[in-house]
């Protein structure tokens, strides 16, 4: 049985989601699927965060250095002429063989983009060829532009590419992908194995991550920092329109000037995950009491509303699966939307 490489042409598009979800789905079918990430990026510690998360979720006993044998960091380019380059592929091969020995197959997660690592001869295409893998491309929805990416990847990987999975597809575009994109690719010899719709739960961001990204400090509610926020809204309207505006989105973060108590209190009347108060303001006791009663974290940041909104824009819009509360949802989405049995047959 062939092992599988999950490739992508864009970071944050669903590789970890699909990799972990496929491992769970294959295990439910009696296949002992393990996880492997040939090349990673240094995270909070010395190991790749995705690999650490997957190992925890899947209960893997392998040494982290085998699960992700090459970890890139800021010094990788300067070291590219030495040991990093010369021994990197050997470490990948050795780690792969040790991990595979404990499983029926490995689902291998690629870097953010399939051509990343090429300067070390460790791109997705290099690894797929060296390890004799089959590949599945994750295509994050981006309109017709993604058809270029899929066709180009097919040209590079050729018969090693089993097909594509469309990911993060908005509900309004599902029909277009199913009835236009997928048939077009089929006519060009590229199989579509499923369409993962955009999912608010998987896109949600922990309040703690929001505070960290904005360099904010909790005024109240740090104990609710694991609450997941599904979207964000900017409070910059008149008070009479605030309530109806904030009611549009549940489980949101509201970014508002710290001196706009009228808007802050309006937001607290609606389902809100956190308040981000800009301008270094400390809110009144009334606000703090209402926030505590509603179990809403209040975060103060030094910058203005525009800067805070820009910081949140970079946080939202990427699939984020490093919370265990999302694992069941990942498994459900893969079972409902991915042709796992057809994929398994193609790996035989």
Predicted features by range, described:
Residues 3-91, 95-98, 181-184:
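N-terminal phosphate/diphosphate-binding loop that engages ATP/GTP or pyrophosphate donors
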Residues 111-194, 259-322:
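Conserved catalytic-core segment of NTP-binding enzymes
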Residues 78-120, 125-129:
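Phosphate-binding/switch loop-helix module in NTP-utilizing enzymes
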Residues 27-31, 41, 56-63, 97-101, ...:
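Generic secondary-structure signature for well-ordered alpha-helical cores
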Residues 99-102, 243-252, 267-271:
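Flexible, charged surface loops at secondary-structure boundaries
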Residues 110, 195-257, 313-348:
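Non-catalytic interface/targeting segments
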Residues 3-5, 32-34, 52, 104-106, ...:
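Structural motif
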């Amino acid at each position: 049985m062939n092992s599988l490489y999950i490739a992508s042409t864009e970071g944050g598009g669903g590789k970890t989601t699909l990799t972990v979800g496929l491992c769970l789905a294959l295990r439910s079918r009696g296949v002992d699927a393990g996880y492997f990430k040939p090349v990673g990026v240094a995270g909070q510690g010395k190991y790749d965060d995705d690999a650490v998360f997957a190992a925890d979720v899947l209960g893997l006993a392998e040494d982290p250095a085998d699960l992700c044998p090459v970890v890139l960091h800021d010094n990788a380019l300067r070291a590219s002429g030495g040991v990093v380059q010369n021994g990197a592929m050997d470490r990948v091969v050795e780690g792969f063989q040790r991990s595979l020995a404990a499983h029926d197959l490995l689902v291998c997660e690629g870097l953010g983009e399939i051509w990343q690592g090429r300067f070390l001869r460790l791109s997705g295409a290099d690894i797929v060829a060296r390890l004799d893998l089959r590949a599945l491309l994750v295509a994050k929805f981006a309109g017709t532009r993604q058809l270029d990416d899929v066709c180009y990847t097919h040209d590079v990987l050729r018969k090693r590419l089993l097909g594509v999975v469309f990911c993060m597809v908005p509900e309004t575009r599902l029909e277009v992908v199913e009835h236009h994109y997928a048939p077009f690719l089929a006519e060009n010899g590229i199989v579509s194995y499923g369409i993962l719709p955009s999912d608010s739960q998987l896109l949600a961001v922990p309040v703690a991550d929001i505070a960290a990204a904005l360099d904010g400090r909790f005024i109240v509610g740090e104990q609710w920092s694991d609450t997941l926020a599904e979207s964000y809204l900017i409070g910059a309207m008149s008070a009479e329109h605030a309530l109806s505006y904030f009611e549009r989105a549940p489980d949101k973060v509201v970014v508002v000037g710290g001196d706009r108590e009228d808007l802050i209190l309006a937001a607290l009347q609606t389902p809100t995950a956190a308040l981000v108060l800009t301008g270094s303001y400390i809110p009144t006791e009334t606000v703090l009491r209402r926030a505590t009663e509603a179990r809403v974290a209040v975060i103060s940041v030094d910058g203005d509303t525009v800067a805070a909104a820009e910081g949140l824009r970079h946080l939202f819009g990427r699939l984020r699966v490093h919370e265990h509360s999302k694992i069941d949802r990942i498994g459900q989405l893969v079972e409902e939307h991915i042709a796992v049995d057809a994929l398994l047959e193609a790996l035989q």
